[in-house]
């Protein structure tokens, strides 16, 4: 194995992109702090069992053994460690936390994606109110507005919509599993065969249209009102409708869509979930939702929770570089160190020229197309 190559799925970060990424992290962190969230940080290494509830198709964590022979992993997720933290300490919810850190997932070769991803997000644990979802979405909207991210589409869904329809259809477990598999995989011919025996069911017109129920929120709600009984709309869809109204009031620049055909990101999601992307983008800029089963793997008492996570790398790629400013070198004699440092502090894009002679300083400035500020009265023997 070469010592000159990086492992597949990793990269070095430097230059303008690294600066954009670091500035972005600072911007998001300050937003969370100003909103009253408390900082939380968990270890990079966790026991493998912490992530049992995590289901990410085609991805595996980096895994190793500790000195006791226990399986530990580099965290593939930042939410479950917070559930572990809450269940093993005397912290009393509700809590409002914010975090920033890297996650690691070994993805398929040639997938074109990276195994190391930086995330920044918030967790509101102990809140049942729909206001918790709104708080997450509000923070996300304000951050995107601050960053100047326009042409943003926010897609909303509900983790319990499919289960509720299946319960209404009164399918047995085997039939329900087959139905969900075909539906989420978009296997339309199989799906049509599965709904054919339900032709006399009052929901059959809805079932025929269901695979295409995604898009503009007003259009989808109008279709649902036409196709579904009123009690389903009231019970399951009212929170979605209220959330769409909230977003249109608070963030009229957002394009809000509904997708009632998508699988929840994880099995522990229990309500509204969401993600956002820009036109032409191939990655979600942020995502999140409600997961009231978050603590199911750690304790019997379940706690309501809502979370939001920004993909820092995806957002970084959407941000422009800062306007180019010419580099300036400041050169001075050793006795002028303090004066040179003061000049650097007050000169845009300046740095100390760490060479011994004026000739070397001039050569360095020429090589990097930089300006040169010479503080030395004359060349001297050092």
Swiss-Prot record:
InterPro entries in the cross-refs: aa-tRNA-synth_II/BPL/LPL (IPR045864), HisRS-like_core (IPR041715), HisRS/HisZ (IPR004516), HisZ (IPR004517)
A GO term, aspect molecular function: histidine-tRNA ligase activity
Pfam families, alphabetized: tRNA-synt_His
Endpoints of the signal sequence: none
Keywords per UniProt: Amino-acid biosynthesis, Cytoplasm, Histidine biosynthesis
Location relative to the cell: Cytoplasm
Domain of life from the UniProt record: Bacteria
Cysteines paired by S-S bonds: none
Record flagged with keyword Cytoplasm: yes
One Gene Ontology term from the biological process aspect of the record: L-histidine biosynthetic process
Main function: Required for the first step of histidine biosynthesis. May allow the feedback regulation of ATP phosphoribosyltransferase activity by histidine.
Quaternary structure annotation from Swiss-Prot or TrEMBL: Heteromultimer composed of HisG and HisZ subunits.
Other noteworthy facts: This function is generally fulfilled by the C-terminal part of HisG, which is missing in some bacteria such as this one.
PANTHER family per UniProt: ATP PHOSPHORIBOSYLTRANSFERASE REGULATORY SUBUNIT, HISTIDYL-TRNA SYNTHETASE
Family assignment from sequence similarity: Belongs to the class-II aminoacyl-tRNA synthetase family. HisZ subfamily.
Full protein name: ATP phosphoribosyltransferase regulatory subunit
Organism encoding this protein: Lacticaseibacillus casei (strain BL23)
């Amino acid at each position: 194995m070469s010592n000159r190559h990086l492992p597949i799925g990793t990269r070095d970060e430097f230059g303008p992109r690294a600066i954009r990424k670091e500035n972005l992290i600072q911007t998001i962190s300050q937003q969370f702090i100003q909103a009253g969230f408390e900082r939380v940080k968990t270890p990079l290494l966790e026991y493998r069992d912490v992530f049992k509830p995590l289901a990410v198709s085609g991805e595996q964590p980096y895994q190793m053994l500790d000195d006791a022979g226990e399986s530990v992993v580099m965290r593939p997720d930042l939410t479950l460690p917070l559930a572990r933290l809450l269940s093993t300490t005397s912290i009393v919810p509700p809590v409002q936390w914010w975090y920033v850190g890297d996650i690691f997932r070994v993805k398929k070769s040639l997938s074109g994606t990276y195994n190391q991803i930086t995330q920044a997000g918030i967790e509101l644990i102990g809140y049942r109110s729909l206001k918790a979802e709104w708080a997450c979405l509000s923070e996300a909207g304000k951050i995107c507005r601050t960053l100047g991210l326009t042409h943003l589409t926010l897609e909303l869904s509900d983790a319990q919509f499919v289960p509720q329809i299946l319960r209404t259809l009164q399918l047995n477990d085997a039939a329900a599993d087959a139905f969900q598999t075909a539906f989420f995989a978009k296997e339309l011919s199989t799906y049509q065969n599965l709904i054919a025996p339900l032709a006399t069911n009052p929901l059959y017109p809805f079932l025929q249209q269901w695979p295409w129920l995604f898009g503009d929120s007003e259009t989808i709600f109008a279709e649902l009102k036409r196709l579904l009984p009123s009690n389903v709309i009231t019970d399951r869809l009212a929170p979605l409708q209220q959330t769409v109204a909230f977003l249109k009031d608070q963030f009229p620049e957002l394009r809000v869509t509904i997708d009632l055909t998508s699988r929840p990101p994880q099995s522990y999601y229990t309500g509204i979930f969401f993600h956002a992307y820009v036109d032409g983008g191939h990655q979600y800029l942020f995502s999140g939702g409600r997961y009231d089963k978050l603590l199911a793997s750690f304790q019997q008492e379940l706690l309501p929770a809502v979370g939001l996570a920004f993909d820092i790398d995806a957002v970084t790629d959407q941000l422009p570089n800062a306007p180019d400013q010419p580099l300036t070198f400041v050169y001075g004699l050793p006795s002028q160190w303090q004066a040179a440092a003061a000049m650097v502090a007050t000169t845009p894009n300046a740095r100390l020229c760490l060479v011994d002679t004026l000739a070397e300083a001039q050569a360095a400035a020429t090589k990097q197309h930089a300006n040169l500020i010479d503080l030395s009265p004359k060349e001297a023997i050092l």
